[in-house]
Amino acid sequence: MFQSYPKLCDILKDKFKFILIDEYQDTNPVVVEIFLQHLKQSNRKNIIGFFGDSMQSIYEDGVGDLNAYIQAGEVYEVQKEQNRRNPSLVIELANRLRTDGIEQHPSTDNHAPNMQDGRVKEGNIKFYYSAQGVDDLETLKRTLDWDFDNAIQTKELNLTHNLIAPKAGFGELMEIYDDDKIIDYKNRITKYIKENNVATDFSEKTFGEVIEILKDGKTGRELNQVNPTPGMQTFIDAHSEQFEDAKQYPFDVFKKIYLDKDSLLDDTKKDKEDENKKGTKRDELIKHLFKIQNNINLYKEERYNEFLRKTEYRISSIADKQSLKDTIVTLDSMSDETIEDVIDYAHDNGICKKDDKFDTFLRDKEYVYTQVKRIKFQVFQNLFYYLEGYTPFSTQHKIKGAEFDNVLVVLDNGNWNKYNFEYLMNVEIFDGLTTLKKSSFEKILNRTQKIFYVCCTRAKENLVVFYNLPSDAIIEKAKMWFGEDNVIRI
């Protein structure tokens, strides 16, 4: 619109004489184009400032850098060379990691966070690796003797939630929401129906009946299109009872079930002081479980007025107070009971009623509830405390902008093919790659360089990087970056 209607450019410049854009590297290129190209249609004056660091452009939909505009004279660059956060050893490491030519140095401000007694803190950097075919991460954590219970001071940074889930104790829930190949197979079937314009009326059919109808009369390649892929079949073979249950659901209901990590993990806090964002993609079952745990916590923290508002629990006598206390004590001790038992107990005792949204979820996504309800409530509680920022675990993307005294960076791709830490620390690997992998090498390397830079520069005191089973080339690169004495085999 700004391109087509110059009057809008006049209005914007009249309204805002100064436009300051924070974290510019994450700004959509179209927005940058509006500010730096389309606004030139107006003769009115204003100033636009971009604040950020291109080395921290870790989101794919961001502009990344303004190099093209700088080279064209559209933007004047003021380089921020003073570093107020990191100790000197981390600053030196960060300078080795930077690819934009900027070299930072400690702030000269004696009141800067990284200054102590008029001098910049030295800090500590270490690169640990395991070479025995055993992941020695837990051994390393015991060796470090950091307080991993203090999520404000100490963080373990992993690339993906999938890597964190088993460590934080909610792996069973993660498998349901992010690794259900039966749902993937359902998606394969619905895609086949749509792309092949299958006109059959399936409204009265079950998922299993639809599969049989589509398979009927097909052989060879045609049959393969409606059969599970090998990966799906492996999952189905291992979860045969679950698959048989899935086949009994009405297809019109089952085809609308979609599962993804956001339904489970959206709105993850950096720490317990972080605020929840408005709106969340969590599904109604997870929201309901959150209400139960929040209500338990409100009572235990003696926030009784807030508890009564949230639950609408009625207290009219001393006996009611004692009954409520007994109920909370019982509910709080049900960690080893199933999620279904906890939901039913909380409902029956007025702690968290099953509302219309919960009932709708149960009706439309019974398949999901059937799996979740069998899991111990402790698994959900582990998820709760992870999402609420009580644990030391965080994804490497989540902590941009944050800072911690102690940072442990785990270099594991987690089967995410957009990143590759081996590329980062052994660029000579390029020559041995296939043609296809060579075509994506630069993009993957760029992403990995920047996420690693972001992770390392979160440390205010101590930085430790861990790599399981590195090659000799990776160890040599680590010695170049961290110093030979700081590269340690566990």
Give the label of every model feature segment.
Residues 1-490:
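The feature marks helicase ATPase cores and/or their adjacent C-terminal helical subdomains
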